[in-house]
Each structure stands twice: as C-alpha cells, then as structure tokens.
C-alpha cells in the first residue's frame, strides 16, 4: 500500500484550502491526486521536499514497480475475466498503472531524471527523515524506517492507504496483501 505519515497529513489538514480534512476522505485516485498535487504545491509550508518518496529505479531496486505495483492491473484484469491464471496478460489497466506511477514521479522528493539513481533505502530514508508524506511499500517497511539514523517518524504515525489507480469501484478497495506470484515470459527471447 501507500505508507503515510499521519503527522504530516495532520499538518496538511490544518492548512487553509486543504482539499480534505482527514484521510477518510481519500478513497479514490481522483481524490488522492487532488490532495497530492495540492500538498506538492504547499511542500514548503509542510516542511517536506515532496509528497512521495523518490521512486527507486536503480537496477535491482525497481521491484516495487515491476512486481508489487503491477499486481493491481493484473488483479483487475483477472477479476474482469473471472480467472485465477492467464496465459497472456493484455494489460487492460495500463492507464491505471500509469496514473499512480506518474503521480509518484511528478510529486516526488526529487526530479524525475534522478530516479534511475535512487534505491529503496533512499526512499525509506526520505520518509523516515520527514522529507515526504508518503511512500509505497509494505508492512515490513517499519523496521527499515525505524532503523534510519535520525528517524523522525513515530511508529504511531505510520499508517496505510490503498493504492488507488482510477479503477471503477475502487472506493471499496482495501489494502493489497501478499506478494506477486506470476511469471512473465517473452516468447521472442
């Protein structure tokens, strides 16, 4: 899911013109995007470098995007087809994947051109040091966050939000659980 820092969010809720007054109001991609873009425009007031931690695209560090985030469009495609397995994935929900990925990149702690040099440790450090309000990761992330030297995030302020992508009916979506369990094979390789 999306881990968020409740303390930073509470600070945002108190700002004049905040798009929401509580996390309970964020139940769709449309609302998440509205809030993230508003927070990014007010990052100086919030004392953050960006809403989302840097997207770790260093080779070997990109598993959050190639697997964990990819679970969502695959899940919805399987759900539509009422199957548990497919020989071929059409990536019908690629635009939804792009929605959230672009939101992460465009409202980040760093410029998009630097993301190829960022690691998971970098993104979790940014979160731990209070430089961002949100980071995509799992419930195992707390041990990494807590282990960062200079960590400013209290354990009670670490909360989770579903990863919204703009799929119809997502307001009823919960948190993703488990990890990926699929293989993609290029028949041309």
Where do the model's predicted regions map?
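Short glycine- and hydrophobic/aromatic-rich loop-to-beta-strand nucleating segment
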Residues: 1-4, 9, 183-185
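Extracytoplasmic/periplasmic solute-binding protein
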Residues: 2, 30-86, 132
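A local structural motif
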Residues: 15-23, 86-90, 105-118, 131, ...
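Short helix-initiation/N-cap motifs at beta->coil->alpha
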Residues: 26-31, 114-129
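Glycine-centered hinge/linker elements that transmit conformational signals in sensory
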Residues: 33-38, 76-117
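Beta->alpha turn/N-cap motifs
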Residues: 120, 137-142, 179-181
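Paired acidic/hydrophobic, glycine-rich loop segments that form the ligand-binding mouth/hinge
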Residues: 133-137, 159
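Extracytoplasmic/periplasmic substrate-recognition and gating elements
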Residues: 149-189
């Amino acid at each position: 899911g999306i881990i968020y820092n409740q303390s930073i969010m509470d600070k945002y809720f108190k700002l004049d013109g905040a798009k929401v007054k509580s996390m309970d109001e964020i139940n769709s991609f449309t609302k998440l995007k509205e809030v993230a873009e508003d927070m990014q425009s007010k990052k100086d007031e919030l004392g953050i470098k960006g809403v989302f931690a840097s997207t770790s695209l260093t080779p070997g560090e990109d598993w959050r995007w190639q697997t964990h985030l990819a679970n969502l469009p695959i899940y919805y495609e399987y759900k539509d087809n009422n199957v548990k397995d497919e020989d071929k994935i059409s990536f019908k929900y690629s635009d939804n994947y792009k929605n959230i990925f672009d939101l992460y990149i465009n409202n980040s702690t760093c410029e998009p051109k630097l993301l190829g040099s960022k690691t998971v440790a970098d993104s979790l450090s940014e979160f731990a040091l209070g430089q961002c309000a949100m980071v995509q990761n799992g419930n195992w992330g707390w041990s990494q966050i807590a282990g960062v030297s200079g960590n400013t995030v209290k354990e009670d302020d670490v909360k989770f939000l579903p990863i919204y992508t703009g799929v119809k009916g997502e307001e009823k979506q919960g948190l993703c659980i488990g990890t990926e369990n699929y293989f993609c094979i290029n028949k041309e390789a």
